[in-house]
Amino acid sequence: MARLCAFLMILVMMSYYWSACSLGCDLPHTYNLGNKRALTVLEEMRRLPPLSCLKDRKDFGFPLEKVDNQQIQKAQAILVLRDLTQQILNLFTSKDLSATWNATLLDSFCNDLHQQLNDLKACVMQEPPLTQEDSLLAVRTYFHRITVYLRKKKHSLCAWEVIRAEVWRALSSSTNLLARLSEEKE
């Protein structure tokens, strides 16, 4: 029984290895599932009705043209997605959120992001990209604007609700980018 279990574990690890290491570094299926789960949990984290924070809405200038660029190479896209995921994780693990979110949902969301980040890091190590600094700078500048906004709004519940919705849109864009890259591969 122990040998069978060990054999099955090796098969699982090899299937993960081959999916991550194949030509073009295909992200494991778990990445897409984690992304969908993160979007669902982020939606569940809503604490206020959308209309209650209209006065706090702001256009943070999500760099969609940099993230979903038709000319972006897969290796560059992986790097941009990794940075986007890392910035979201940094935002939702900051000390300034205290009791803003339900702890169980926040943990679930952050765990999904950690898993996605690990998948993306494995791909970056497999296929070092030709860095596209302007894309990375655009993502970092976007998150800097979000951080400044939160500070200016003193991390209010409405400000965090606006950010939650903004991050949901950013994650949705990353899902669209991955879908497009997958279609191009086929």
UniProtKB/Swiss-Prot annotation:
Keyword annotations from UniProtKB, A to Z: Antiviral defense, Cytokine, Disulfide bond, Glycoprotein, Secreted, Signal
Subcellular location per the Swiss-Prot or TrEMBL entry: Secreted
Gene Ontology molecular-function annotations: cytokine activity; cytokine receptor binding
Disulfide linkage: C25-C123, C53-C158
One BP term from GO: defense response to virus
Domain of life the protein comes from: Eukaryota
Signal peptide bounds: 1-24
Family according to the record: Belongs to the alpha/beta interferon family.
Name assigned to this protein: Interferon alpha-4
Source organism phylogeny: Eukaryota, Metazoa, Chordata, Craniata, Vertebrata
Gene designation: Ifna4
